[in-house]
Amino acid sequence: MVNRRDLIKWSAVALGAGAGLAGPAPAAHAADLEWEQYPVPAAPGGNRSWQLLPSHSDDFNYTGKPQTFRGRWLDQHKDGWSGPANSLYSARHSWVADGNLIVEGRRAPDGRVYCGYVTSRTPVEYPLYTEVLMRVSGLKLSSNFWLLSRDDVNEIDVIECYGNESLHGKHMNTAYHIFQRNPFTELARSQKGYFADGSYGYNGETGQVFGDGAGQPLLRNGFHRYGVHWISATEFDFYFNGRLVRRLNRSNDLRDPRSRFFDQPMHLILNTESHQWRVDRGIEPTDAELADPSINNIYYRWVRTYQAV
């Protein structure tokens, strides 16, 4: 736990968290106190209230991977998968220090990219709200906070950001995917990106870009909050710094030819990874970029999850 001096220092800078916390080097902090500054932006509905889920919430206010970490998280893929494209998921490339979970991208000897990967030991179920305060990396890899079902069929991307990009590096890219695994096919999906002021910036299905991003922050330059309210099997609301930016439901983008939708629990995932479509286009991090600690790390200050009860 940080001392009183650290707490005072953090309190002074935390006032800007709603608009993003800028700064070259994240410092120690009192995140367990800090997230309480931010009311859950979503209403729990009915006569329910929000109850914190300690099993899926962490202030990362410790060092290394003690039982505090290991009781909640796995630092490798649950099935031992190495990851997509040139990813090589690695437990050695995530750690906790200075009040942050740090997830790193670094060159592997075989030419692939070591990618830190952390997932919750147990899944969560709706109705819930989950949110991270994070700073994306500056790499050509994606910086992510997402949810995935145990059978790898249902996926919700709260944020998937390519921090190196001048425009897309300003987007909170949200998405859903519904897969069939055998034989593999993608049954349904929809991706949309949003700027920090809440404006619509990108349609991933058509490739359309809306606005030039002038005056919008590059997400690699500061901490921002990214959250999702999983309301039901067919309803999700996405929040950027506490602002509602997207409603996903059957009246707009949500489809499922199976008519099951998101009817099963999902695990939380915090990671970085390589994507095949970018590899195919030659968009890959260089050795120098992967060795540069000023851009090759994602910093997660905290993750909090609440159940509506």
Swiss-Prot record:
SUPFAM superfamilies attached to this UniProt entry: Concanavalin A-like lectins/glucanases (SSF49899)
Active site: residue positions: 155, 160
Domain GH16: 33-309
Catalytic activity: Hydrolysis of (1->4)-beta-D-galactosidic linkages in agarose, giving the tetramer as the predominant product
Entry superkingdom: Bacteria
Pfam families: Glyco_hydro_16 (PF00722)
InterPro entries: Beta_agarase, ConA-like_dom_sf, GH16, GH16_AS, Glycosyl_Hydrlase_16, TAT_signal
Name of the protein: Extracellular agarase
Source organism of this protein record: Streptomyces coelicolor (strain ATCC BAA-471 / A3(2) / M145)
